């Protein structure tokens, strides 16, 4: 804006003044140097004869003075000329550089969000897998026999202070990420190598388990014969197929649940027809065809298009800014480019003739033509439509002395609702129009606007101006706001009907003609003529401006039909800059060629919006489910910020590190209030009911620890050899770890340990396995005592399981010297579930075949009428001026 540029100029003036001062100082120094030489000569002992005429000296001083003054004046002239050139260059530079920087990275992130059904399931969901474990004799030596147990597939606990509860929360998160929308067993079935008649089993992991069991020497003959008989059973009349699978009972429950609660729905032509936005279906400019009959097995997954349950527009400034920015960039990419604009050179030549610039020396009118080019016009067209589609706030940049910019700004403020501009920018622009054009026309005094006044300059002017046409136009601009209309369940920001049909431009022209007829009594004649010529330039293009307004409205409304999230209007943190000279370019260069979005562009825009919206809702459901799970697992305080961060990361477009903490916690509070989706709740209940089974199958989670003051012997165990393990807690005093952590009362446990009574702390906790005999001798498990007796902490408790057998290092120390190893702790660990082939064989049922289509609009072939014949909502051509 104007006052900013003045500041910039003042800085350059100061810098140049400093340079001038430096130059003068250097000259003074040079003038002083002969004086110093003269004094040296006087003081020197050398004899020199000096003869100088006094008059000559005086004359030369005067000449020097006059030369100095002339050079000063010359420098002043040069300085002002240089300043003027800089100003002109700055203006030209400002007006020709486009304000928009395309951010391809955000656009790519948005377009890369694909519907989840694109991820094809190739395996069943599994937490467990059967593993062959050795058996150890009484003396710790390994036998040749093996035994099968169910163990965890991913048995990983991170290092450091870690609660087993976090393991279950991460497991739940992993299940949510892998939870399929549908399962088609036929697609994942593989051949059973051991089958007699080339039968198939449900997936590759089932086939691998069958192979391993078949090759195991200890497998019974009956089981081998059964594996040879395993194959699919097809019921073609019911479109159903049954596949044999080998699954842990918990895994079977998961997969059975996924099969029973698939999200696929039958797909037919009616659904595709209704999927296309209604306004595009009913738009006579678009010709849509569906020439494909879908098979009865066609399926689709309905996108989750619930409206924004978090209300991100309310009190989430930085998040809302990011969303609107990404929507703006996407919208700019789909707004069509203007075609057949008027030649810039020809238009400037015509404008010069209208202005009679050859006969004029007024510099202000040459500014009218500065910066007019077709790139700026196209940029302005895209910016206006994209900003309205994304509800991005705009700021106006202009020079007050360029009357043509201000007159173009009058068209802009007429067509675009006031809410779209940042308040300060709107006030500055309106004030410039009032004080440069409107008030001088009627001979009124300049408006002195108070900063912070609730009324805008136009609202004040409306009450003071007597002229009906001008006051009528001001009234329209003051009340020009979006109408909020719900269409197909989506809140749309709709333009006023007078703007849509272009009638408002006639209203603007009436006001402008009234202004040009006024006398401008307090201003010079040249000023009046400049304004009149500027108005003349715009009024000569009345027909084109009406067409431009209709074209702008049509493109905005057509693209708006493809938006699926409510268009909430809230001022954004950052703004999109709009140069008023680019608005002048648009007004003066718009041709009569109609441009409308191509059907392919519309479908692309619609698909990207649907995919983002659906992904947004799914991620909300995940976050709500994980917050509920964290609450149920007593991890609410510990995990909350990371849950919200993960939620934002999965939305793809956010730079999570830069989101302020207050918005993170506000987001957490909003997520807490939402109900959990039923599928996700059922999945958590499945995990919660079977936590003990999962703990038993892990090699890193124990069910408790026994602590004694005196050493306890390591016992013999078939699974491990010599081990400090307890399979039951008979005869031990038991204390619940949960209650101990909750109460913080360590007196009971400390007294028992000091009285030489062993105590069992019962509860899930992580442990470490060590098979080195040397470390068993070296360690006295001081870590366990220190945590409890001294530090009084059990949340970081991590006991060591000593496992000594023929696979261990230094096993000979035990075997050869009949040494009985001891430990002050015992790990309470229940035996994992043994693998039973018959109990693990399940038949899974699914549809024999169906095809899931993700891109429904691929079936629609679309074309447009000739753009010249395209009509607007009032059934009249968009562009009438031919």
From Swiss-Prot:
Region (Disordered) residue spans? 1-47
Q: What is known of its domains?
A: The N-terminus binds RNA. It is necessary for encapsidation of VP1 and VP3. The N-termini of 10 VP2 molecules form a cylindrical hub underneath each 5-fold axis of the inner capsid.
Which portions of the sequence form the region Hydrophobic?
396-416, 424-444
- Could you identify this protein by its name? Inner capsid protein VP2
> Which residue windows does the record flag with biased composition (Basic and acidic residues)?
9-27
Q: Mark out the compositionally biased spans (Polar residues).
A: 28-39
Q: Name one GO cellular component term.
A: viral inner capsid
Record-linked InterPro entries: Rotavirus_VP2
Principal location: virion
5-fold hub: where is this region? Answer: 1-82
Give the organism the record lists.
Rotavirus A (isolate RVA/Monkey/South Africa/SA11-H96/1958/G3P5B[2])
